[in-house]
């Protein structure tokens, strides 16, 4: 069968309707859950890099030194200093801090040997910087996206990478993708966020288009696709026309009573909700393409996320994360003003909703418990 793995970025399980989300609507992901299996206890890592390495290599992130974690920002520097592709390739390869042993096995490599054509679209590999030679060594026939995960936190890069070449994104002028600070607040940060100069082509749209094209081109071959989108990783950034939750009454009401500068954060929360909804629409586009190509009965679709929930819609992400001397809950959801309760999870025989302790960057439930849905109509029971 074809295998399509949709891998969200920083998406807490509580942000999806099928896992109990009440404000943000995710009908396409909910449909996947309804027609397949929805896991309530799937565990990943506390942040992106080790989670993605485990996914692609099958190694436990704490027990193996065989994967290479590099520093981020190299592609940003390359653009600012005018490096050629060849210069960047050499510098990226030299930047590897943990040298691979040479005996590793990679998921796309195995599937390629089994006759699959392999494609990765989005936030490439595990980061924080990868390069063409590494991607080919791992078994990817086609790739389009960000080689630099630091740059992937900006949604309007001037180019993406496509099979070793730069794929220009029209109208974009920012070497760092137009990234703004990850915490939200009034003043200079908000002014910069509101400046749309050099922000024309939304990178997730370009990566989705390349994914759908790859599916069309390989409809008669077994495909493995890793759609590793950077949605909804912060800082919040969505095309204004797609800010579907602007002025949402439940969000506005929650923030009206917030303390201090957090009263100014309702707009960020609305944009974050719109980013999750955008992710859901992209899942819907992939499902529609599967249907259009007549591939439903021979396509396994897996949906998951790299780690637990993160707060990108308040003025201070860190307050409340520490474990108190009495062993109290880490994230203090009420204090942190998470109107979405993105760290919620299903628990118990009746799947009651609870607030999970911890967020991204912690090894507590809210940081490492992630959504997992598997759908294969006619084969996987629902």
PLM regions: where:
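Short beta-strand segments enriched in small/hydrophobic residues
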Residues: 2-8
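Short, hinge-like loop/turn segments at secondary-structure boundaries
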Residues: 56-61, 136-139, 319-320
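Active-site-proximal cap/lid insertion segments
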Residues: 8-24, 31, 40, 44-47, ...
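Active-site segment of extracytoplasmic enzymes that catalyze sulfate/phosphate-ester chemistry
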Residues: 13-116, 130, 152, 166, ...
